Amino acid sequence: MYLRAVHAEAQISILQQLIRDNPLGILTTAIKSPLYPLIQSSHIPFVLDAPETSDGSLSNGVLRGHMAKQNPQAKALIEALTAQQEQGNTSLELSDEVLVLFNGPHHHYVTPKFYTETKPATGKVVPTWNYAAAQAYGKIRIYCDSKSEETMTFLQKQIEELSHQSETSIMKYSSPWQVSDAPVSYVELLKKNIIGIEITIDRLQGKFKMSQEMGQGDRDGVISGFENLGTDAGKCIANIVRERGEMKDKK
């Protein structure tokens, strides 16, 4: 990710909130395999744990999710873990880092017509795209042995907390659906067909590319342009452009 200073977000808490608000991440791995592609990606909803460190500061956090065992990416992960364990390394953590990318709720093309100051003055404007994103790098831990109590405990906790997060934070239900509402035998069967993944975040980076690099007149034009679209996405982006512009001006 290109982290131009004017767009980069350095506050871990803000990036973590972006992840919590938009938990569907894209997991990307690069695993050498005779059977599967080197680079693979999958959309996975995550739970983010972010405990405080020993000095009271906020940790980068840990991402927890699950994947279908039939997913080729999951098969490559299992293959890599098996090869590692056959060499005497009993850890469930793979040595190579992975990447998870999270996108903000809205992104949009920005037409040069929005630049109401520079376009009529010089014409030196080009289109761009506004968006927000966070990327997390870290080592991945694989829970794939359905005969292991550790794996089944991890999966049970993960699916329960992911369901609760989605039912309450996304759906806003006061009486959310719970995993316990489904037959135990059915849940146990499904658990045997998924793997758990846990990623300890070593580096958390992100950006809000929201026209901060433009002057006040052009930013005002961008805000008006998005508001005049009359869409939820337009209204949301207009608000973020305004907010991020004010933050830049205060620095």
UniProtKB/Swiss-Prot annotation:
Domain of life, per the record? Eukaryota
Q: Which Gene3D superfamilies match?
A: Electron Transport, Fmn-binding Protein, Chain A
Q: Which SUPFAM superfamilies match?
A: FMN-binding split barrel
Any one Pfam family match given in the protein's UniProt record, by short name: FMN_bind_2
Question: Which residues pair up as cystines?
Answer: none
Enumerate the InterPro entries for this protein: Split_barrel_FMN-bd, TR_PAI2-type
- Family affiliation: Belongs to the PaiB family.
Name of the protein: Uncharacterized protein AN0679
